């Protein structure tokens, strides 16, 4: 389907039936949402785009238009229980032949709408993200004290910020280079949101309810809390968001204010943040509550094509270490009333999950093969962690 016929940059067509409400999108590598947002060589749809897709789909379903009238909020201005389950990755040459077709479904739920973003494969759904939309009835929050935030912390300029995120594996084009300046201390960070000079702003802002470029910048502001380490071997990826509230139209956003969510704590590999998008005088435009991130290894940074074409390593010899010890995932079996699970049981379970996720033949996955050989990315690894935890207990990153 041509861009001219699209209902929204993230929705090409309404594919609803009498039984279900759904919309379709065909993603190509040359779209700015993918071309300007990469981790390593991989074009990855930003998590912020999942939220925009849900908001615009709900407007289409309820109002018949993808965007609310100028100056209005969406009918459903709160998004709850957002889960980013898998990344949507598109190969660099996926112009038409290899473009990925995804869909979003909507289902009524307690006065709101549940949504699911997925790729259909026959009767099966590969789910990338989910959540719930509902009305926003909370009063306008108190404004932030911009004067305090602008004078309380270390200052990072655009070039410093761009270098810091490049070190973390991000390859961002102009549409996502929105952090002009960042003021950070140990507990909070304030970022000035501004597109680089020379960028045509209209295509990346005007067609959206919540422009993914700006929301992505707000999410990355949280990673600047405490300053930027000179070296890092992990990526902090968003995995869940408890609530997003829209109080005003997005037009006037100038700052992103992030702070640690100490009420919900953090660990060596997880963290929780609260983030506000603010206008020029500190009024809250958008509020994000309990953004959960997880630190994952720099895996999945190879090109998607290379990962898909990679051959597994040789079968494990008698003395080889299991894949769970290959500096990617370490499983600690839960102690049961009887003897703890054997190493073989853990390895066999992990192999079965890898086969399930990648759809490779059983003979192509070996215990000695690095997870990156099988095209696994960071979010898939998180999924493996969850499955191992459900089977054996606590799973830690190493």
Q: Where on the chain are the PLM-derived regions?
A:
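Acyl-thioester-processing domains in fatty-acid/polyketide/NRPS systems
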Residues: 1-324, 328-332, 344, 383
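Phosphopantetheine-attachment site and its flanking helix in carrier
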Residues: 42-56, 348, 362, 369-395
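A broad, structural micro-motif
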Residues: 77, 239, 365-366, 395
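Low-complexity, intrinsically disordered or signal/transmembrane-proximal segments
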Residues: 335-336
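Short alpha-helical segments that sit at the start of domains
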Residues: 340-347
């Amino acid at each position: 389907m041509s861009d001219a016929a699209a209902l929204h940059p993230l929705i090409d067509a309404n594919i609803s039936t009498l039984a279900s409400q759904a919309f379709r999108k065909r993603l190509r590598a040359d779209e700015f949402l993918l071309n300007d947002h990469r981790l390593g060589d991989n074009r990855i749809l930003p998590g912020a785009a999942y939220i925009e897709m849900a908001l615009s789909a709900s407007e289409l379903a309820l109002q018949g238009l993808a965007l609310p009238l100028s100056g209005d909020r969406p009918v459903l201005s709160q998004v709850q229980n957002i889960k980013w389950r898998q990344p949507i990755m598109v190969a660099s040459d996926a112009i038409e032949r290899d473009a990925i077709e995804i869909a979003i479904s909507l289902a009524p739920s307690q006065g709101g709408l549940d949504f699911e973003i997925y790729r259909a494969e026959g009767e099966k759904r590969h789910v990338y993200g989910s959540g719930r939309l509902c009305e926003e009835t909370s009063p306008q929050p108190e404004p932030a004290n911009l004067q305090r935030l602008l004078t309380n912390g270390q200052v990072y300029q655009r070039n410093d910020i761009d270098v810091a995120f490049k070190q973390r594996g991000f390859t961002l084009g102009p549409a996502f280079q929105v952090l002009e300046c960042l003021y950070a201390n140990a507990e909070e960070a304030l970022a000035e949101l501004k597109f680089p000079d020379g960028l045509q702003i209209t295509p990346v802002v005007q067609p959206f309810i919540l422009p993914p470029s700006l929301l992505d910048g707000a999410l990355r502001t949280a990673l600047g809390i405490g300053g930027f380490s000179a070296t890092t071997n992990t990526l902090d990826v968003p995995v869940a968001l408890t609530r997003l509230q829209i109080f005003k139209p997005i037009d006037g956003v100038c700052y992103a204010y992030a702070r640690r969510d100490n009420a919900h704590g953090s660990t060596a590999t997880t963290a929780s943040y609260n983030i506000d998008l603010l206008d020029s005088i500190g009024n809250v435009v958008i509020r994000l509550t309990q953004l959960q991130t997880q630190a994952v290894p720099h895996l999945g940074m190879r090109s998607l094509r290379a990962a898909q074409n990679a051959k597994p390593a040789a079968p494990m010899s008698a003395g080889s270490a299991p894949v769970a010890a290959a500096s990617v995932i370490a499983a600690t079996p839960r102690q049961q009333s009887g003897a703890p699970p054997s190493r073989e049981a853990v390895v066999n379970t992990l192999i079965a999950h890898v086969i399930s996720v990648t759809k490779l033949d059983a003979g192509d996955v070996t215990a000695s093969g690095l997870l990156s050989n099988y095209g696994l990315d960071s979010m898939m690894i998180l999924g493996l962690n969850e499955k191992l935890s459900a089977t054996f207990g606590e799973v830690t990153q190493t």
